[in-house]
Amino acid sequence: FLYLAYTAPHWPHQAHEEDIDKYRGKYSMGWDQLRQSRYERQIKLGLFEEKHRLSPRDSKVPAWTSLKPEKQKEMDLRMAVYAAMIDRVDRNIGKLISVLKKQDLFDSTLILFMSDNGACAEGETLGRGNIFDVKKRNLEINNNYGAAWANASSTPFRLYKHYTHEGGSATPFIMHWPKGIKSQRKWYRHSAQVLDVVPTLLEVCGVAYPETYQGHELYPLRGISLTPSFSAKPLTRTKPMFSEHENNAFMIDGSWKLVGKGVATPKGPDIKKWELYNLKDDRTELKNLAQTENQRLKEMADSWHAWSLEDKVYPKPSGKKKKRKN
């Protein structure tokens, strides 16, 4: 078993100059054109259906054409550095695969590749930290590309890491195992979550999940095995998927998604902040059905609250910092 966790492309955004040079100028068209072209390619590849519309540009992000040429040059470089980081990750994963092939282990190795969250919009809207001076850039500890490029990275979704809307929580997940997964050459559209990884690996290895470990009782195993997907069969999920992150939350039950910003307050969930979407028809969360599907929203909100108590989301701290004693 090998767990390979890259920090890239998390900030600070830093990369080798020879990698950056490959991408200089490639983003000079700006985020507006990039979002549109990526969306059109996603539709062409069948990743999304045309009924799932491209979300509007984030309201805090300016139009690319409104920037002065010098600022456009800076922003092109910020994205080039980010792209260079991913380029280096990609090549090093390629090295690992090459070794597996040389050792005749590639076909029998199950590879799981995923991201932990959506694009990061932390910091200034147009990025932060020095980007032109190479020495200073590589000494920065928090420089990044900003919400403007993160908005493009999340295409076609809206919002980012920290939020539980699709732009923050829906990420790529690739499983590769020539000896165990039948190639279907088509998109598999059943939802999975990170909690499904352990049940999947346990089943593949033929290992039962223990009730105790070193005399301590273990929490029940959450999630389901994804092995039905190996032959393109539907997943047998009988319970909704729940999440809470930094007071934001979601619940997905079939095609219905309950989601909200700042829902999980210290006093309990704020039902007024819940939004409701039918992901089957509206994957980009543009049509909030909270008013027209009020009863469904209430039932899902009650289910989320019950889960939050069971999984100890509550009680939450008040948020008031205690004064330190000297």
Annotated model-derived regions:
Residues K71-D87, T164:
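Short acidic-aromatic active-site loops that bind/stabilize oxyanions
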Residues F1-D58, M85, V89, V99-M114, ...:
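Active-site regions of oxyanion-processing enzymes, predominantly non-cytosolic
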Residues V61-R78, H176-K182, K280-E285:
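Short glycine/proline-rich turn/loop motifs
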Residues L139-G168, G180-H190, V194-L279, E310-Y314, ...:
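C-terminal cap/loop subdomain of S1 sulfatases and analogous C-terminal strand-loop tails that border
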Residues H13-A15, S98-W177, N326:
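Histidine-centered active-site microenvironments of extracellular/periplasmic hydrolases
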Residues L2-P12, L54-P62, L112-A121, G127, ...:
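Short, solvent-exposed turn/loop segments enriched in Gly/Ser/Thr/Pro and often Arg
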Residues F1-Y3, D107-L112, F173, K239-M241, ...:
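Beta-sheet entry/capping signal
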Residues I20-R24, Y39-I43, A83-I86, D90, ...:
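Non-transmembrane alpha-helical segments in soluble domains
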